[in-house]
Design a protein with these regions (language model features):
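A short alpha-helix capping/helix-coil boundary motif
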Residues: 2-5, 40-41, 64-68
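General secondary-structure edge motif
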Residues: 8-9, 33, 40, 70
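Histidine/lysine/aspartate-rich catalytic loop segments that bind and position anionic ligands
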Residues: 20-51
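C-terminal active-site subregion of NodB/CE4 polysaccharide deacetylases
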Residues: 30, 47-156
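Extended, charge-rich helix/loop segments that form flexible
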Residues: 1-31, 152-156
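Residue-level signal for pocket-adjacent positions within structured domains
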Residues: 15, 40, 109
Length: 156
């Protein structure tokens, strides 16, 4: 079972040229993937007003649900960044699971602050630009965790 988080505002291909299209998402959904949200316009929640955060969360959720016909309960925080306010907003808007690259987990909302491994294109390549199973293995086994640090102070 795989979960895929995405931004719902996919019609703007000039801003997000590598985004999946709705037909791609619908095909993935039919193939059994669980589709989750990643905001509507790729904002960083901690940098926005509560009004904007709610609008982004609700808008993304609604758009994906309309296209897939399935409730959206998964959310991936952009860059893994969140504040207690953002966690409360996720809960308020009906999400049940929130994924972050930050190792901090809110003990009051453990399912809304689930740590995940952050990998991006090029994150597991060697000095010559080739895929490196050794680097990937180190990342997966937490032996080389440069992407697992979080400078944000979380107050719970």
């Amino acid at each position: 079972e795989r979960i895929f988080g995405l931004m719902a505002d996919l019609d703007d291909s000039s801003r997000f040229p590598l985004s999946l299209t709705w037909p791609m998402i619908e095909e993935m959904h039919r193939a059994g993937m669980i589709i989750g949200s990643h905001t509507r316009t790729h904002i960083s929640l901690p940098a926005e007003s509560m009004e904007t955060v709610i609008k982004e969360l609700e808008g993304s959720k609604r758009a994906i649900e309309e296209r897939t016909g399935t409730p959206v309960v998964h959310f991936a925080y952009r860059g893994g960044q969140f504040t207690p306010r953002d966690v409360a907003a996720l809960e308020r808007t009906g999400y049940r699971f929130g994924y972050t690259a930050c190792p901090h987990q809110d003990p009051q909302h453990p399912t809304l602050t689930i740590e995940r491994l952050l990998l991006w294109e090029g994150s597991s390549v060697d000095g010559d630009g080739r895929f490196s199973p050794a680097i990937l293995s180190c990342q997966i086994n937490d032996l080389w965790p440069p992407a697992r640090t979080c400078a944000r102070v979380h107050h719970v």
